[in-house]
UniProtKB/Swiss-Prot annotation:
PROSITE patterns named among the record's database cross-references: ALDEHYDE_DEHYDR_CYS, ALDEHYDE_DEHYDR_GLU
Subunit comment: Dimer of dimers.
Gene that this polypeptide is encoded by: betB
Name this protein carries in UniProt: Betaine aldehyde dehydrogenase
InterPro entries in alphabetical order: Ald_DH/histidinol_DH, Ald_DH_C, Ald_DH_CS_CYS, Ald_DH_CS_GLU, Ald_DH_N, Aldehyde_DH_dom, BADH
Keywords: Metal-binding, NAD, NADP, Oxidation, Oxidoreductase, Potassium
Amino acid sequence: MSRYGLQQLYINGAYVDSTGNDTFDAVNPANGDIIACIQSATAADVDRAVSAATAGQKVWAAMTAMERSRILRRAVDILRERNDELALLETHDTGKPLSETRTVDIVTGADVLEYYAGLIPMLEGQQIPLRDTSFVYTRREPLGVVAGIGAWNYPIQIALWKSAPALAAGNAMIFKPSEVTSLTALKLAEIYTEAGLPAGVFNVLTGTGKSVGQALTTHPGIAKVSFTGGIASGKTVMANAAGSTLKDVTMELGGKSPLIIFDDADLDKAADIAMMANFFSSGQVCTNGTRVFVPKALQAQFEEKILACVQRIRAGDPTDESVNFGPLVSFPHRESVLRYIESGKREGARVLVGGEPMTDGDYAQGAYVAPTVFTDCRDDMKIVRKEIFGPVMSILTYQDEDEVIRRANDSEYGLAAGIVTRDLNRAHRVIHQLEAGICWINTWGESPAEMPVGGYKHSGVGRENGVTTLEHYTQIKSIQVELGEFRSVF
Protein backbone atom coordinates (compact mmCIF):
# COMPACT_ATOMS: atom_id res chain seq x y z
CA MET A 1 0.00 0.00 0.00
CA SER A 2 1.32 3.45 -0.93
CA ARG A 3 1.81 6.08 1.77
CA TYR A 4 -1.38 8.01 0.96
CA GLY A 5 -3.44 5.18 -0.54
CA LEU A 6 -6.27 5.58 -3.05
CA GLN A 7 -7.42 9.14 -3.72
CA GLN A 8 -11.01 9.71 -4.89
CA LEU A 9 -12.70 12.72 -6.44
CA TYR A 10 -14.26 15.38 -4.21
CA ILE A 11 -17.79 16.31 -5.32
CA ASN A 12 -20.67 17.87 -3.39
CA GLY A 13 -18.84 18.01 -0.08
CA ALA A 14 -17.60 14.41 0.01
CA TYR A 15 -15.17 11.94 -1.51
CA VAL A 16 -16.75 9.87 -4.28
CA ASP A 17 -15.52 7.27 -6.73
CA SER A 18 -15.00 8.20 -10.35
CA THR A 19 -17.53 6.79 -12.79
CA GLY A 20 -14.57 5.43 -14.77
CA ASN A 21 -11.83 2.94 -14.00
CA ASP A 22 -8.69 4.90 -14.93
CA THR A 23 -6.14 5.82 -12.28
CA PHE A 24 -2.68 7.36 -12.21
CA ASP A 25 0.16 7.40 -9.69
CA ALA A 26 1.55 10.19 -7.57
CA VAL A 27 5.34 9.82 -7.45
CA ASN A 28 7.75 11.32 -4.93
CA PRO A 29 10.45 12.83 -7.17
CA ALA A 30 13.03 12.67 -4.39
CA ASN A 31 13.18 8.88 -4.51
CA GLY A 32 10.78 7.57 -7.16
CA ASP A 33 8.37 6.05 -4.62
CA ILE A 34 4.70 5.79 -5.58
CA ILE A 35 2.92 7.63 -2.78
CA ALA A 36 -0.71 7.48 -3.95
CA CYS A 37 -3.04 6.05 -6.58
CA ILE A 38 -5.42 8.72 -7.88
CA GLN A 39 -8.72 8.23 -9.67
CA SER A 40 -9.25 9.97 -13.01
CA ALA A 41 -12.49 11.87 -13.51
CA THR A 42 -14.65 11.38 -16.59
CA ALA A 43 -16.95 13.65 -18.56
CA ALA A 44 -19.81 12.19 -16.52
CA ASP A 45 -18.01 13.24 -13.34
CA VAL A 46 -17.66 16.76 -14.71
CA ASP A 47 -21.43 16.80 -15.26
CA ARG A 48 -21.94 15.59 -11.67
CA ALA A 49 -19.65 18.29 -10.33
CA VAL A 50 -21.33 21.03 -12.37
CA SER A 51 -24.75 19.95 -11.10
CA ALA A 52 -23.52 19.93 -7.50
CA ALA A 53 -21.78 23.28 -7.95
CA THR A 54 -24.86 24.87 -9.52
CA ALA A 55 -27.01 23.86 -6.56
CA GLY A 56 -24.37 24.76 -3.97
CA GLN A 57 -23.68 28.14 -5.51
CA LYS A 58 -27.28 29.23 -5.02
CA VAL A 59 -27.03 28.45 -1.30
CA TRP A 60 -23.64 30.15 -1.00
CA ALA A 61 -24.64 33.30 -2.88
CA ALA A 62 -27.77 33.66 -0.74
CA MET A 63 -25.68 33.96 2.41
CA THR A 64 -24.80 37.39 3.70
CA ALA A 65 -21.35 38.81 3.07
CA MET A 66 -20.44 38.40 6.74
CA GLU A 67 -21.59 34.76 6.77
CA ARG A 68 -19.39 33.95 3.78
CA SER A 69 -16.51 35.87 5.30
CA ARG A 70 -16.70 33.92 8.58
CA ILE A 71 -16.64 30.57 6.79
CA LEU A 72 -13.59 31.49 4.73
CA ARG A 73 -11.86 32.82 7.85
CA ARG A 74 -12.47 29.46 9.54
CA ALA A 75 -10.82 27.78 6.57
CA VAL A 76 -7.83 30.09 7.05
CA ASP A 77 -7.56 29.03 10.69
CA ILE A 78 -7.68 25.34 9.76
CA LEU A 79 -5.05 25.80 7.07
CA ARG A 80 -2.72 27.40 9.59
CA GLU A 81 -3.42 24.74 12.22
CA ARG A 82 -2.59 22.01 9.69
CA ASN A 83 0.34 23.85 8.11
CA ASP A 84 3.01 21.29 8.97
CA GLU A 85 0.91 18.30 7.89
CA LEU A 86 0.03 19.93 4.57
CA ALA A 87 3.62 21.07 4.03
CA LEU A 88 4.92 17.51 4.41
CA LEU A 89 2.31 16.24 1.94
CA GLU A 90 3.30 18.98 -0.52
CA THR A 91 6.96 18.06 -0.11
CA HIS A 92 6.30 14.38 -0.79
CA ASP A 93 4.21 15.24 -3.86
CA THR A 94 6.37 17.98 -5.40
CA GLY A 95 9.88 17.36 -4.08
CA LYS A 96 10.07 20.92 -2.76
CA PRO A 97 12.13 21.30 0.42
CA LEU A 98 10.15 21.17 3.65
CA SER A 99 11.94 24.36 4.67
CA GLU A 100 10.11 25.98 1.75
CA THR A 101 6.67 24.36 1.93
CA ARG A 102 6.38 25.05 5.68
CA THR A 103 7.10 28.74 5.29
CA VAL A 104 5.75 29.63 1.84
CA ASP A 105 3.21 27.39 0.14
CA ILE A 106 0.45 27.01 2.72
CA VAL A 107 1.31 30.26 4.51
CA THR A 108 0.97 32.46 1.43
CA GLY A 109 -2.10 30.60 0.20
CA ALA A 110 -3.81 31.14 3.55
CA ASP A 111 -2.85 34.81 3.42
CA VAL A 112 -4.67 35.19 0.09
CA LEU A 113 -7.78 33.48 1.45
CA GLU A 114 -7.74 35.72 4.52
CA TYR A 115 -7.33 38.78 2.31
CA TYR A 116 -10.38 37.95 0.20
CA ALA A 117 -12.44 36.92 3.22
CA GLY A 118 -11.89 40.45 4.48
CA LEU A 119 -12.88 42.01 1.16
CA ILE A 120 -16.26 40.28 0.83
CA PRO A 121 -18.27 43.06 2.51
CA MET A 122 -16.76 45.67 0.15
CA LEU A 123 -18.41 44.12 -2.91
CA GLU A 124 -20.79 47.02 -3.32
CA GLY A 125 -22.76 48.56 -6.13
CA GLN A 126 -23.21 52.23 -7.01
CA GLN A 127 -26.09 54.67 -6.99
CA ILE A 128 -26.06 57.06 -9.95
CA PRO A 129 -28.54 59.97 -9.98
CA LEU A 130 -30.00 60.84 -13.39
CA ARG A 131 -32.59 63.51 -12.58
CA ASP A 132 -34.96 64.38 -9.75
CA THR A 133 -37.28 61.47 -10.49
CA SER A 134 -34.87 58.79 -11.70
CA PHE A 135 -31.67 57.07 -10.69
CA VAL A 136 -29.60 54.01 -11.57
CA TYR A 137 -28.12 51.56 -9.12
CA THR A 138 -25.75 48.68 -9.80
CA ARG A 139 -25.22 45.29 -8.20
CA ARG A 140 -22.14 43.08 -8.36
CA GLU A 141 -23.43 39.55 -8.79
CA PRO A 142 -21.48 36.28 -8.94
CA LEU A 143 -20.81 34.60 -12.28
CA GLY A 144 -22.10 31.22 -11.08
CA VAL A 145 -19.94 28.12 -11.49
CA VAL A 146 -16.30 28.70 -12.42
CA ALA A 147 -13.43 26.32 -13.15
CA GLY A 148 -9.86 26.52 -11.92
CA ILE A 149 -7.08 24.56 -13.61
CA GLY A 150 -3.82 24.47 -11.67
CA ALA A 151 -0.15 23.97 -12.47
CA TRP A 152 2.16 21.53 -10.75
CA ASN A 153 4.68 23.90 -9.16
CA TYR A 154 2.57 25.50 -6.39
CA PRO A 155 -0.38 23.09 -6.02
CA ILE A 156 -2.15 24.30 -2.88
CA GLN A 157 -1.13 27.92 -3.30
CA ILE A 158 -2.57 28.03 -6.83
CA ALA A 159 -5.75 26.28 -5.65
CA LEU A 160 -6.14 29.01 -3.04
CA TRP A 161 -5.22 31.85 -5.41
CA LYS A 162 -8.00 30.70 -7.73
CA SER A 163 -10.65 29.63 -5.23
CA ALA A 164 -10.33 32.51 -2.76
CA PRO A 165 -11.60 35.36 -4.99
CA ALA A 166 -14.09 33.06 -6.72
CA LEU A 167 -15.70 31.96 -3.45
CA ALA A 168 -15.48 35.41 -1.91
CA ALA A 169 -17.57 36.77 -4.79
CA GLY A 170 -20.26 34.13 -4.24
CA ASN A 171 -19.31 31.66 -6.96
CA ALA A 172 -18.79 27.91 -6.79
CA MET A 173 -15.60 26.37 -8.16
CA ILE A 174 -14.60 23.10 -9.77
CA PHE A 175 -10.84 22.78 -9.46
CA LYS A 176 -8.63 20.49 -11.52
CA PRO A 177 -5.12 20.19 -10.09
CA SER A 178 -2.21 19.12 -12.25
CA GLU A 179 -2.07 15.36 -12.56
CA VAL A 180 1.58 15.61 -11.48
CA THR A 181 0.75 17.11 -8.06
CA SER A 182 -2.88 16.51 -7.10
CA LEU A 183 -2.83 15.66 -3.41
CA THR A 184 -3.04 18.95 -1.50
CA ALA A 185 -5.98 20.27 -3.55
CA LEU A 186 -8.02 17.36 -2.23
CA LYS A 187 -7.03 18.27 1.33
CA LEU A 188 -8.09 21.85 0.66
CA ALA A 189 -11.55 20.58 -0.33
CA GLU A 190 -11.78 18.77 3.02
CA ILE A 191 -10.80 21.96 4.84
CA TYR A 192 -13.40 24.07 3.07
CA THR A 193 -16.10 21.55 4.03
CA GLU A 194 -14.90 21.43 7.64
CA ALA A 195 -15.04 25.23 7.75
CA GLY A 196 -18.72 25.20 6.78
CA LEU A 197 -18.68 25.77 3.03
CA PRO A 198 -21.96 24.42 1.61
CA ALA A 199 -21.76 21.14 -0.29
CA GLY A 200 -20.91 21.60 -3.95
CA VAL A 201 -19.26 25.01 -3.62
CA PHE A 202 -15.70 23.64 -3.99
CA ASN A 203 -15.13 20.42 -5.90
CA VAL A 204 -11.89 18.74 -7.01
CA LEU A 205 -11.66 16.61 -10.14
CA THR A 206 -8.35 14.86 -10.72
CA GLY A 207 -7.11 13.74 -14.12
CA THR A 208 -5.42 14.98 -17.27
CA GLY A 209 -5.93 18.20 -19.14
CA LYS A 210 -6.93 16.34 -22.27
CA SER A 211 -9.84 14.65 -20.53
CA VAL A 212 -10.95 16.62 -17.46
CA GLY A 213 -9.58 19.98 -18.60
CA GLN A 214 -11.20 19.65 -22.01
CA ALA A 215 -14.56 18.77 -20.46
CA LEU A 216 -14.41 21.70 -18.04
CA THR A 217 -13.41 24.32 -20.60
CA THR A 218 -16.19 23.32 -23.00
CA HIS A 219 -18.96 22.69 -20.47
CA PRO A 220 -21.98 24.99 -20.96
CA GLY A 221 -22.58 25.14 -17.21
CA ILE A 222 -19.29 26.87 -16.46
CA ALA A 223 -19.06 30.67 -16.72
CA LYS A 224 -15.32 31.30 -16.32
CA VAL A 225 -12.02 29.41 -16.48
CA SER A 226 -8.91 30.42 -14.56
CA PHE A 227 -5.88 28.55 -15.91
CA THR A 228 -2.20 28.37 -15.01
CA GLY A 229 0.13 26.55 -17.39
CA GLY A 230 1.95 26.82 -20.70
CA ILE A 231 1.21 28.98 -23.74
CA ALA A 232 0.08 26.13 -26.00
CA SER A 233 -2.32 24.76 -23.40
CA GLY A 234 -3.53 28.28 -22.64
CA LYS A 235 -4.42 28.86 -26.28
CA THR A 236 -6.41 25.61 -26.28
CA VAL A 237 -8.25 26.63 -23.11
CA MET A 238 -9.05 30.05 -24.56
CA ALA A 239 -10.31 28.55 -27.82
CA ASN A 240 -12.48 26.06 -25.95
CA ALA A 241 -13.87 28.78 -23.71
CA ALA A 242 -14.72 31.01 -26.67
CA GLY A 243 -16.06 28.19 -28.80
CA SER A 244 -18.45 26.86 -26.18
CA THR A 245 -20.25 29.62 -24.29
CA LEU A 246 -17.97 32.67 -24.52
CA LYS A 247 -16.56 31.97 -21.07
CA ASP A 248 -14.48 34.61 -19.35
CA VAL A 249 -10.85 33.52 -18.90
CA THR A 250 -7.92 34.35 -16.67
CA MET A 251 -4.55 32.86 -17.64
CA GLU A 252 -1.03 32.83 -16.26
CA LEU A 253 1.14 31.28 -18.96
CA GLY A 254 4.72 31.54 -17.76
CA GLY A 255 7.67 33.69 -18.66
CA LYS A 256 11.31 34.19 -19.55
CA SER A 257 11.87 37.18 -17.37
CA PRO A 258 14.79 39.64 -17.48
CA LEU A 259 16.76 40.70 -14.43
CA ILE A 260 18.86 43.79 -15.23
CA ILE A 261 21.84 44.62 -13.04
CA PHE A 262 23.12 48.16 -13.55
CA ASP A 263 26.69 49.37 -13.13
CA ASP A 264 25.93 51.19 -9.86
CA ALA A 265 24.38 48.13 -8.20
CA ASP A 266 25.63 46.53 -5.02
CA LEU A 267 26.95 43.34 -6.63
CA ASP A 268 26.59 41.25 -3.48
CA LYS A 269 22.91 42.18 -3.32
CA ALA A 270 22.56 41.66 -7.07
CA ALA A 271 24.01 38.16 -6.81
CA ASP A 272 21.66 37.28 -3.95
CA ILE A 273 18.68 38.52 -5.97
CA ALA A 274 19.81 36.57 -9.04
CA MET A 275 20.11 33.41 -6.95
CA MET A 276 16.55 33.76 -5.61
CA ALA A 277 15.32 34.59 -9.11
CA ASN A 278 16.76 31.37 -10.51
CA PHE A 279 17.19 28.64 -7.89
CA PHE A 280 14.33 29.04 -5.41
CA SER A 281 12.08 25.99 -5.66
CA SER A 282 14.76 24.42 -7.89
CA GLY A 283 13.99 27.01 -10.54
CA GLN A 284 10.37 25.94 -10.97
CA VAL A 285 8.75 29.36 -10.58
CA CYS A 286 6.83 31.10 -13.37
CA THR A 287 8.30 34.50 -12.59
CA ASN A 288 11.95 33.42 -12.48
CA GLY A 289 14.45 35.99 -13.76
CA THR A 290 16.40 33.57 -15.91
CA ARG A 291 17.85 36.18 -18.31
CA VAL A 292 20.37 37.98 -16.13
CA PHE A 293 21.79 41.08 -17.87
CA VAL A 294 25.10 42.36 -16.50
CA PRO A 295 27.30 45.25 -17.72
CA LYS A 296 30.18 43.81 -19.75
CA ALA A 297 32.72 45.50 -17.49
CA LEU A 298 31.28 43.75 -14.42
CA GLN A 299 30.83 40.27 -15.91
CA ALA A 300 33.86 38.60 -14.33
CA GLN A 301 33.22 40.13 -10.91
CA PHE A 302 29.55 39.15 -10.99
CA GLU A 303 30.38 35.59 -12.04
CA GLU A 304 32.73 35.24 -9.07
CA LYS A 305 29.98 36.31 -6.70
CA ILE A 306 27.48 33.89 -8.27
CA LEU A 307 29.97 31.03 -7.89
CA ALA A 308 30.37 31.91 -4.22
CA CYS A 309 26.59 31.98 -3.76
CA VAL A 310 26.15 28.59 -5.44
CA GLN A 311 28.33 27.09 -2.71
CA ARG A 312 25.59 27.98 -0.22
CA ILE A 313 23.03 25.78 -1.97
CA ARG A 314 22.23 22.77 0.21
CA ALA A 315 20.79 20.01 -1.97
CA GLY A 316 19.46 16.81 -0.49
CA ASP A 317 16.45 14.99 0.94
CA PRO A 318 13.68 17.61 0.86
CA THR A 319 12.27 16.40 4.19
CA ASP A 320 15.54 17.47 5.86
CA GLU A 321 14.84 21.02 7.03
CA SER A 322 18.45 22.07 6.49
CA VAL A 323 18.03 21.44 2.73
CA ASN A 324 17.13 24.41 0.51
CA PHE A 325 17.29 22.75 -2.93
CA GLY A 326 15.30 19.66 -3.87
CA PRO A 327 14.64 17.58 -6.97
CA LEU A 328 12.59 18.66 -9.94
CA VAL A 329 8.90 17.81 -9.81
CA SER A 330 9.10 14.66 -11.95
CA PHE A 331 11.47 12.45 -13.88
CA PRO A 332 10.04 13.44 -17.30
CA HIS A 333 10.53 17.10 -16.37
CA ARG A 334 14.13 16.41 -15.37
CA GLU A 335 14.75 15.01 -18.86
CA SER A 336 13.22 18.13 -20.40
CA VAL A 337 15.50 20.40 -18.36
CA LEU A 338 18.56 18.32 -19.25
CA ARG A 339 17.72 18.62 -22.95
CA TYR A 340 17.71 22.41 -22.62
CA ILE A 341 21.06 22.28 -20.84
CA GLU A 342 22.55 20.21 -23.64
CA SER A 343 21.21 22.67 -26.22
CA GLY A 344 22.95 25.49 -24.36
CA LYS A 345 26.25 23.65 -24.55
CA ARG A 346 25.78 22.92 -28.27
CA GLU A 347 24.97 26.55 -29.06
CA GLY A 348 28.16 27.80 -27.44
CA ALA A 349 27.16 29.04 -24.00
CA ARG A 350 29.87 28.49 -21.39
CA VAL A 351 28.95 26.42 -18.33
CA LEU A 352 30.07 28.34 -15.28
CA VAL A 353 28.81 25.69 -12.86
CA GLY A 354 26.56 22.62 -12.97
CA GLY A 355 25.19 21.46 -16.29
CA GLU A 356 24.64 17.85 -15.25
CA PRO A 357 22.11 15.61 -13.49
CA MET A 358 22.88 14.78 -9.86
CA THR A 359 23.17 10.99 -9.73
CA ASP A 360 25.61 10.15 -6.94
CA GLY A 361 24.70 8.64 -3.60
CA ASP A 362 21.51 10.01 -2.10
CA TYR A 363 20.59 11.65 -5.42
CA ALA A 364 20.63 8.42 -7.45
CA GLN A 365 16.93 7.66 -7.09
CA GLY A 366 15.65 11.22 -7.44
CA ALA A 367 14.94 13.73 -10.22
CA TYR A 368 17.83 16.02 -9.33
CA VAL A 369 19.61 18.46 -11.65
CA ALA A 370 22.61 20.45 -10.48
CA PRO A 371 22.18 24.22 -10.18
CA THR A 372 23.41 25.43 -13.56
CA VAL A 373 24.78 28.80 -14.64
CA PHE A 374 25.54 29.55 -18.28
CA THR A 375 27.51 32.64 -19.27
CA ASP A 376 28.58 34.23 -22.56
CA CYS A 377 24.98 33.68 -23.68
CA ARG A 378 23.37 35.20 -26.78
CA ASP A 379 19.80 36.36 -27.23
CA ASP A 380 19.16 33.82 -30.01
CA MET A 381 20.05 30.76 -27.91
CA LYS A 382 17.28 28.33 -27.02
CA ILE A 383 18.13 28.55 -23.32
CA VAL A 384 17.61 32.32 -23.53
CA ARG A 385 14.41 32.22 -25.60
CA LYS A 386 12.44 29.35 -24.05
CA GLU A 387 11.02 28.80 -20.58
CA ILE A 388 13.06 25.93 -19.10
CA PHE A 389 11.39 25.83 -15.67
CA GLY A 390 14.44 24.47 -13.95
CA PRO A 391 17.60 25.59 -12.13
CA VAL A 392 19.25 27.20 -15.15
CA MET A 393 20.55 30.80 -15.13
CA SER A 394 21.70 32.55 -18.32
CA ILE A 395 24.10 35.49 -17.95
CA LEU A 396 24.14 38.02 -20.79
CA THR A 397 26.25 41.17 -21.07
CA TYR A 398 25.28 44.62 -22.38
CA GLN A 399 26.84 48.04 -23.00
CA ASP A 400 24.17 50.68 -22.30
CA GLU A 401 20.68 51.30 -20.95
CA ASP A 402 18.86 51.60 -24.28
CA GLU A 403 20.38 48.35 -25.50
CA VAL A 404 19.43 46.35 -22.42
CA ILE A 405 15.84 47.65 -22.41
CA ARG A 406 15.42 46.67 -26.06
CA ARG A 407 16.87 43.20 -25.49
CA ALA A 408 14.93 42.64 -22.27
CA ASN A 409 11.69 43.31 -24.16
CA ASP A 410 12.67 41.07 -27.09
CA SER A 411 10.58 38.10 -25.95
CA GLU A 412 7.15 36.62 -26.56
CA TYR A 413 6.78 36.55 -22.78
CA GLY A 414 6.00 39.46 -20.48
CA LEU A 415 5.32 38.04 -17.05
CA ALA A 416 7.97 39.61 -14.83
CA ALA A 417 11.04 41.84 -14.85
CA GLY A 418 13.39 43.36 -12.34
CA ILE A 419 16.29 45.74 -11.96
CA VAL A 420 19.04 46.27 -9.40
CA THR A 421 20.33 49.84 -9.05
CA ARG A 422 21.01 52.55 -6.47
CA ASP A 423 19.64 55.25 -8.81
CA LEU A 424 15.96 55.85 -8.01
CA ASN A 425 15.37 57.91 -11.16
CA ARG A 426 16.85 55.19 -13.35
CA ALA A 427 14.87 52.53 -11.50
CA HIS A 428 11.51 54.05 -12.37
CA ARG A 429 12.56 55.21 -15.84
CA VAL A 430 13.60 51.70 -16.85
CA ILE A 431 10.80 49.81 -15.12
CA HIS A 432 8.23 51.94 -16.94
CA GLN A 433 9.71 50.82 -20.27
CA LEU A 434 9.82 47.09 -19.52
CA GLU A 435 7.02 45.03 -21.06
CA ALA A 436 6.06 42.95 -18.04
CA GLY A 437 3.12 42.74 -15.68
CA ILE A 438 5.04 42.08 -12.45
CA CYS A 439 8.13 44.17 -11.76
CA TRP A 440 10.59 44.38 -8.89
CA ILE A 441 13.20 46.99 -7.99
CA ASN A 442 16.08 45.77 -5.80
CA THR A 443 14.18 42.62 -4.84
CA TRP A 444 12.64 39.59 -6.51
CA GLY A 445 9.79 37.14 -6.23
CA GLU A 446 7.41 38.34 -3.54
CA SER A 447 3.74 38.20 -4.58
CA PRO A 448 1.64 39.35 -1.62
CA ALA A 449 -2.13 38.96 -1.62
CA GLU A 450 -2.62 42.68 -2.16
CA MET A 451 -0.54 42.75 -5.36
CA PRO A 452 -2.27 42.02 -8.71
CA VAL A 453 -0.09 39.58 -10.66
CA GLY A 454 -0.25 38.61 -14.31
CA GLY A 455 1.52 38.98 -17.59
CA TYR A 456 1.81 41.02 -20.76
CA LYS A 457 1.97 39.51 -24.26
CA HIS A 458 1.89 35.69 -24.28
CA SER A 459 2.35 35.47 -20.53
CA GLY A 460 -1.29 35.77 -19.72
CA VAL A 461 -4.73 37.35 -19.69
CA GLY A 462 -6.16 39.04 -16.62
CA ARG A 463 -4.75 39.12 -13.09
CA GLU A 464 -4.70 37.12 -9.88
CA ASN A 465 -4.71 38.62 -6.37
CA GLY A 466 -5.56 42.18 -5.45
CA VAL A 467 -8.94 43.90 -5.47
CA THR A 468 -9.19 43.87 -9.27
CA THR A 469 -9.32 40.06 -9.36
CA LEU A 470 -12.31 39.94 -7.03
CA GLU A 471 -14.18 42.28 -9.35
CA HIS A 472 -13.55 39.97 -12.30
CA TYR A 473 -15.35 37.13 -10.52
CA THR A 474 -18.52 39.24 -10.60
CA GLN A 475 -20.76 40.73 -13.25
CA ILE A 476 -22.46 44.12 -12.98
CA LYS A 477 -26.21 44.44 -13.17
CA SER A 478 -27.53 47.97 -13.82
CA ILE A 479 -31.07 48.91 -12.75
CA GLN A 480 -32.85 52.17 -13.59
CA VAL A 481 -35.62 53.30 -11.27
CA GLU A 482 -38.23 55.86 -12.41
CA LEU A 483 -40.17 57.59 -9.61
CA GLY A 484 -42.14 59.94 -11.83
CA GLU A 485 -44.38 59.56 -14.83
CA PHE A 486 -43.45 57.42 -17.80
CA ARG A 487 -44.21 58.94 -21.19
CA SER A 488 -44.43 56.73 -24.23
CA VAL A 489 -43.79 58.11 -27.70
CA PHE A 490 -46.77 56.14 -28.93
